[in-house]
Curated annotation (Swiss-Prot):
This is UDP-N-acetylglucosamine 3-dehydrogenase. Structural data in combination with molecular dynamics simulation and mutational analysis suggest that Lys-91 or His-164 is likely the catalytic base that deprotonates the 3''-OH group for the oxidation reaction. Keywords: Lipid A biosynthesis, Lipid biosynthesis, Lipid metabolism, NAD, Oxidoreductase. Pathway: Bacterial outer membrane biogenesis; LPS lipid A biosynthesis. Belongs to the Gfo/Idh/MocA family. The lineage of its organism: Bacteria, Pseudomonadati, Pseudomonadota, Acidithiobacillia, Acidithiobacillales.
Length: 313
């Protein structure tokens, strides 16, 4: 148990999960949602308060998750930080980099922890690859495909799904995109529901990322290539295989060895929230801070510009 008063602003589908995790590992003071009935339902489930306003909640907590529509992230986080409350903001960070910069500056001035919910960073496969010492990859490809669900329709598939793989690309390479090309289609909603992006980073790495929220069968895969090996990650099935050049064990592919990495199963959201609270308590960096969240947002906005140009052709 982490002895810290916590709260959740926005307890829709994802916000409810945030509240459950806080209730398990901290002192959950309560929740707020514009839908008072929904807030009361979650509060009853978790035996906490349903606050009548954001301000009322902020007066009773030390840290908060902001799980509201992206268009409201800036305004809600600004009020929270003005109240001296540490913030975990669900991805995407904000609508634009100007809003992100303002929140980063405010957090620094007030010595507050600002975390952005890029949850795939805590996946065991990504943590293993970051610690493996393979260096920056030469090429990455990822596909993140999901059946249509009537959620997160205030944003396009780039900010909804592709942003996860954009974050992992920047994290694994430590580089920035310098050339971005992309296509997309608004198949079901009025925003891009599928998109493919090709990008070159300033260290020479090339990435090819595909995302869709209108498929029948889900898939979440990434393949990462170095000069003498490549890794295949299946996020859906929690598997990691690393194929090394050398003494062969792969049938039909001479000189290639398959290393199946044993990955632990973990509750990613609980790990993310626990890291956030421990960062506050220990005065240490968080798993994904505002600066990192801004980098990913900037890359996603570059992809969006390219997709919108394609849609207008």
């Amino acid at each position: 148990m982490i002895h810290m008063r916590t709260g959740v602003i926005g307890v829709g589908h994802l916000g409810r999960f945030h509240a459950q995790k806080y209730a398990a590992i901290s002192q959950l003071a309560g929740v707020f949602d514009e839908n008072a009935e929904r807030a009361a339902e979650v509060a009853a489930e978790l035996r906490c308060r349903a606050f009548p306003s954001v301000d009322a909640l902020l007066a009773e907590v030390d840290a908060v998750s902001i799980v509201t529509p992206t268009s409201t992230h800036f305004a809600v986080a600004e009020v929270a930080m003005q109240a001296g409350v540490h913030c975990l903001i669900e991805k995407p960070f904000t609508l634009d980099t100007e809003e992100a910069d303002a929140l980063i500056g405010m957090a620094q001035e007030r010595h507050l922890v600002l975390a952005i919910g890029h949850i795939k960073r805590v996946h065991p496969a990504i943590q293993y690859l970051r610690q493996a010492g393979f260096g920056a990859p030469r090429y990455l490809e990822a596909e993140r495909l999901a059946p249509f669900k009537p959620r997160s329709l205030d944003i396009d598939v780039i900010m909804d799904l592709m942003i996860h793989d954009l974050d992992l690309t920047l994290l694994l390479t430590g580089a920035e995109p310098v050339d971005v090309r992309a296509v997309g289609v608004a198949a079901v909603t009025d925003k891009a529901d599928m998109a493919t992006a090709w990008m070159t980073l300033n260290n020479g790495t090339v990435a090819n990322l595909a995302a869709s929220r209108v498929v029948r069968e889900p898939a979440r895969r990434m393949r990462i290539f170095w000069q003498d090996r490549y890794a295949s990650v299946d996020f859906l099935n929690n598997t990691l295989h690393i194929y090394h050049r050398g003494a062969g064990t792969v049938p039909g592919i001479p000189g290639v060895r398959d290393e199946a990495v044993d990955l632990a199963k973990r509750d990613a959201l609980a790990a993310e929230i626990e890291d956030f609270l421990n960062a506050i308590a220990a005065h240490r960096p968080v798993f994904c801070d505002g600066v990192a969240g801004r980098r990913v947002l900037a890359a996603a906005l570059q992809v969006r510009v390219a997709v919108e140009a394609f849609l207008q052709r």
